[in-house]
């Protein structure tokens, strides 16, 4: 077999492949074995027709399509490997010659990864985030814990304030008519949460328990229910109860309730400081890694094929759909509630998808430029850590992964980022 690569404009080119006649005949043999099982000729059992009779009756050309299905994938894969190109999309194949006893000749128009011209990527000057934990940070975390452990108590006197929880009945009307989904009884609503459309929660402020009121609002133009979008509405409200948060005292008892491993408030503060210090250091390290990658990517030049952005967008949508499914939702429900469609979601994700592609291509170029590789020991260590994380044996994990190529590429990328960090100039 022979293969020749001809570069065209942009990121496209043509692969011309010739497969030996002997291999073509083998493909025709395999095709015959497959096709003959489905053919019935009087006087012969199904699948037992002589090859010569089959070709006389149906012509050898009737085997070409199946033979090509057998020959093309293998020949294309070998040609890609032989020429060293990196396709990013399915090829457009054109068969120029397919005949028994002759070689198979076909061309494949292919979009390949772009050439990346690296700019400055060593000695990049980046700022490191301050990872100091202050007493104020600890106090803010204590306040968050205090809020989390607050109790809702009925407000016996007074009126609704921002942050209160109210229990209400409501029914909405548009043009004097009630609408689906616009009615509820004993509904708990946190004022200021933004749960309802703009203007609704604000008009409950100042109401007293037992009071009834009509409030006027307008549905947003982009509201998910098209029949309500942009329309004025009136909601009849009956306020049953007002609840307010009662914060626990910040003392030793509070500390024990929050964390059974501590006995005093001071011990809780110390533990909070240790945790925040660890988190801030990790955040600063992650920000540093992001910064060097971003600068190296900005300094690199490349012409990204649109198909790579499309493929990355597809992957991002699949990831998003998986996250929705974990919440008991799906894309159709998301489109319904958000007022978006697939085209709008794709457009929203396109910029991030292109950024991800640029980062990946830049890191791949650095891996190549610096001859970065991974050892079997590094791969094995990563497998053990992953197996421990997912509570699997290493053998089972390998079985699920199938191939380790993807894992090795991820490790190379990680080492490329390590290289950028190690060779950067960090300023405070």
Curated annotation (Swiss-Prot):
Gene3D superfamilies xrefs: 3.10.50.40, Trigger factor ribosome-binding domain (3.30.70.1050), Trigger factor, C-terminal domain (1.10.3120.10)
GO molecular function: peptidyl-prolyl cis-trans isomerase activity; protein folding chaperone; ribosome binding
Gene Ontology CC terms: cytoplasm
Keywords in alphabetical order: Cell cycle, Cell division, Chaperone, Cytoplasm, Isomerase, Rotamase
Record has Isomerase as a keyword: yes
EC assignment: 5.2.1.8
Subcellular location: Cytoplasm
SS bond list: none
A biological process term (GO) from this entry: chaperone-mediated protein folding
Stated role: Involved in protein export. Acts as a chaperone by maintaining the newly synthesized protein in an open conformation. Functions as a peptidyl-prolyl cis-trans isomerase.
PANTHER family documented for this protein: TRIGGER FACTOR CHAPERONE AND PEPTIDYL-PROLYL CIS/TRANS ISOMERASE, TRIGGER FACTOR-LIKE PROTEIN TIG, CHLOROPLASTIC
NCBIfam families: tig (TIGR00115)
Domain notes: Consists of 3 domains; the N-terminus binds the ribosome, the middle domain has PPIase activity, while the C-terminus has intrinsic chaperone activity on its own.
HAMAP family noted in UniProt: Trigger_factor_Tig (MF_00303)
Protein name: Trigger factor
Biological classification of the source: Bacteria, Bacillati, Bacillota, Bacilli, Bacillales
């Amino acid at each position: 077999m022979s293969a020749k690569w001809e570069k065209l404009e942009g990121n496209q080119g043509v692969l011309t492949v010739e497969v030996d006649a002997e291999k073509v005949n083998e493909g025709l043999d395999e095709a015959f074995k497959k096709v003959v099982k489905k053919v019935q000729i009087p006087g012969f059992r199904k699948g037992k027709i002589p090859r010569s009779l089959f070709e006389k009756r149906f012509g050898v050309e009737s085997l070409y399509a199946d033979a090509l299905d057998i020959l093309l994938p293998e020949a294309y894969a070998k040609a890609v490997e032989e020429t060293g190109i990196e396709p990013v999309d399915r090829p457009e194949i054109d068969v120029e010659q397919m005949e028994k006893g002759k070689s198979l000749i076909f061309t494949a128009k292919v979009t390949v990864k772009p050439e990346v011209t690296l700019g400055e990527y060593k000695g990049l000057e980046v700022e490191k985030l301050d990872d100091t934990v202050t007493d104020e940070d600890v106090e803010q975390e204590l306040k968050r814990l205090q809020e989390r452990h607050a109790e809702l108590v009925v407000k016996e006197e007074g009126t609704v304030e921002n942050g209160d929880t109210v229990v209400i009945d409501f029914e909405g009307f548009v043009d004097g008519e009630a609408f689906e989904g616009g009615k509820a009884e004993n509904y708990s609503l946190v004022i200021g949460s933004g749960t309802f459309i703009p203007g609704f929660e604000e008009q409950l402020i100042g109401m007293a328990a037992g009071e009834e009121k009509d409030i006027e609002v307008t549905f947003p133009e982009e509201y998910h229910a098209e029949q309500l979008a942009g329309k004025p509405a009136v909601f009849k409200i009956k306020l049953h109860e007002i609840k307010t948060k009662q914060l626990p005292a910040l003392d030793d008892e509070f500390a024990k309730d929050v964390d059974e491993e501590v006995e005093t408030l001071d011990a809780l503060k110390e533990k909070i400081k240790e945790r925040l210090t660890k988190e801030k250091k990790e955040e600063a390290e992650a920000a540093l890694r992001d910064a060097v990658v971003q600068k190296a990517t900005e300094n690199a030049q490349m012409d990204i094929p649109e198909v790579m952005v499309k493929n990355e967008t597809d992957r991002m949508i699949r990831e998003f759909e998986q996250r929705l499914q974990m919440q008991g939702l799906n894309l159709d429900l998301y489109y319904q509630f958000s007022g978006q469609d697939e085209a709008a979601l794709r457009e929203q994700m396109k910029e991030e998808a292109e950024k991800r592609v640029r980062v990946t291509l830049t890191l791949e170029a650095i891996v190549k430029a610096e001859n970065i590789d991974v050892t079997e020991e590094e791969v094995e260590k990563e497998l053990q850590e992953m197996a421990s994380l997912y509570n699997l044996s290493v053998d089972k994990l390998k079985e699920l992964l199938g191939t380790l190529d993807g894992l090795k590429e991820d490790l190379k990328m990680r080492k490329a980022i390590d290289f950028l960090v190690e060779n950067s100039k960090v300023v405070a």
